Amino acid sequence: MRNIFKRNQEPNVAPATTTATMPLAPVAPADNSTESTGPGESQEDMFAKLKEKFFNEINKIPLPPWALIAMAVVAGLLLLTCCFCICKKCCCKKKKNKKEKGKGMKNAMNMKDMKGGQDDDDAETGLTEGEGEGEEEKEPENLGKLQFSLDYDFQANQLTVGVLQAAELPALDMGGTSDPYVKVFLLPDKKKKYETKVHRKTLNPAFNETFTFKVPYQELAGKTLVMAIYDFDRFSKHDIIGEVKVPMNTVDLGQPIEEWRDLQGGEKEEPEKLGDICTSLRYVPTAGKLTVCILEAKNLKKMDVGGLSDPYVKIHLMQNGKRLKKKKTTVKKKTLNPYFNESFSFEIPFEQIQKVQVVVTVLDYDKLGKNEAIGKIFVGSNATGTELRHWSDMLANPRRPIAQWHSLKPEEEVDALLGKNK
């Protein structure tokens, strides 16, 4: 047993080996004093090396020291300026956001207060929002006043209207005045319309003009007298200042009447459709001959009681506002779409062709009274729109007839343009 135990223990004993032993240097004990080479000392060495290298590189640059210092100062200033701008922008943005936020809260509070106050007011008055708006009254605009007179002759069945004077009219012109005149007519019939003379540059015109309407007394009650004051403008549409309406069934015509009435706002007159006319122009320069052919008209204004007209056409050759020659067509009875096809010739030398105008007027023939103008146009070198284009086409195509439709214009408008072109 003892032998077995010894045999089992033998492998645990390491065999003796011969190894070369190296002499070891004595190891100094660890010391935490400042004399040891730590990381702080290595960083200082690196910084010193970098500093030395940096100055060596600078010394290689072929510039004087003062130039290098100046460049460094400028670079520093630029850097500081950029930093300042960035900081300022950030601060302003924060301030703006804060201000808008505060303003939004304030507006919300104000709206809430206003709504609450409005609700309280509505509760006190018992009015809803729509009813409150309806109660607001606009102050009437002061348009001035008109003095007029009325006198009815029962034996002659004739109403005499006197337009006496106006006062305190508003200024519609640039100079602080107006050029007023009065239109007088009886509704619902606008065919018979009178006008006073134009009074220049005044707000208190004295008209003192009378006009007569032949109306049976039985029919007078269904009519309304209208006296509308306009501001005359030579080169554009006349502006209405105001009007006085007198329903005749509210007036006692047993004795003459004279009174003042305030002007009320008048409705602007829509441009009246007067109809269209087709004309043909032909000019032969070598012969100095102008041929005007009146072909037809359509959709003319109704001038007669029966809803028709008796139209005919007048042609005037004019130069510098003077009538040189006059021609006219035959009368076409009871029609608003007459067909004429009538030609008229005028002798005009080539050197004068650009100095003349051809005025075409459509009139309604009246056997008993005055023939009334339905509408008017003129063609020539100083015309405008389709009239000027028609004249230019005629001159560009000598010896060739050029036909063109034209819309009729009010007589006074065309006369004003002709007067401007004198």
UniProtKB/Swiss-Prot annotation:
User: What PROSITE patterns does this protein map onto?
Assistant: C2
Enumerate the residues binding Ca(2+) 2: L172, D173, D231, D233, D239
| GO biological process per UniProt | calcium-dependent activation of synaptic vesicle fusion; cell differentiation
Which residues make up the binding site for Ca(2+) 3?
D233, S236, K237, D239
Q: What molecular functions are annotated in GO for this chain?
A: calcium ion binding; calcium-dependent phospholipid binding; inositol 1,3,4,5 tetrakisphosphate binding; phosphatidylserine binding
PTMs? Phosphorylation at Thr-202 by WNK1, changes the calcium requirement for SYT2-binding to phospholipid membranes.
Locate the region Disordered: 1-43, 102-141
Q: How does it sit in the membrane?
A: Single-pass membrane protein
Domain C2: start-end pairs:
142-261, 273-406
Q: How is the cofactor bound?
A: Binds 3 Ca(2+) ions per subunit. The ions are bound to the C2 domains.
What does the UniProt entry say about where the protein is found?
A: Cytoplasmic vesicle, Secretory vesicle, Synaptic vesicle membrane; Cytoplasmic vesicle, Secretory vesicle, Chromaffin granule membrane; Cytoplasm
Residues reported to bind Ca(2+) 4: D304, D310, D364, D366
Phosphotyrosine modified-residue sites: Y230
The residue spans the entry assigns to the Cytoplasmic side of the membrane are as follows 88-422
Cross-referenced Gene3D superfamilies: C2 domain
Biased composition of type Low complexity is found at 14-30
Is Phosphoprotein set as a keyword in this record?
yes
State the InterPro entries in the record: C2_dom, C2_domain_sf, Synaptotagmin
Using the UniProt annotation, give the residues that carry a glycan (glycosylation sites): N32
Q: Which UniProt keywords apply?
A: Calcium, Cytoplasm, Cytoplasmic vesicle, Differentiation, Glycoprotein, Membrane, Metal-binding, Phosphoprotein, Repeat, Synapse, Transmembrane, Transmembrane helix
The record describes its quaternary structure and partners as: Homotetramer. Heterodimer; heterodimerizes with SYT1 in presence of calcium. Interacts with SCAMP5. Interacts with STON2. Interacts with PRRT2. (Microbial infection) Interacts with C.botulinum neurotoxin type B (BoNT/B, botB).
Q: What does the similarity note say? A: Belongs to the synaptotagmin family.
Role: Exhibits calcium-dependent phospholipid and inositol polyphosphate binding properties. May have a regulatory role in the membrane interactions during trafficking of synaptic vesicles at the active zone of the synapse. Plays a role in dendrite formation by melanocytes. (Microbial infection) Receptor for C.botulinum neurotoxin type B (BoNT/B, botB); interaction is improved in the presence of gangliosides. The toxin binds via the vesicular domain (residues 47-60).
This chain belongs to the protein called Synaptotagmin-2
Q: Which organism is it from?
A: Mus musculus (Mouse)
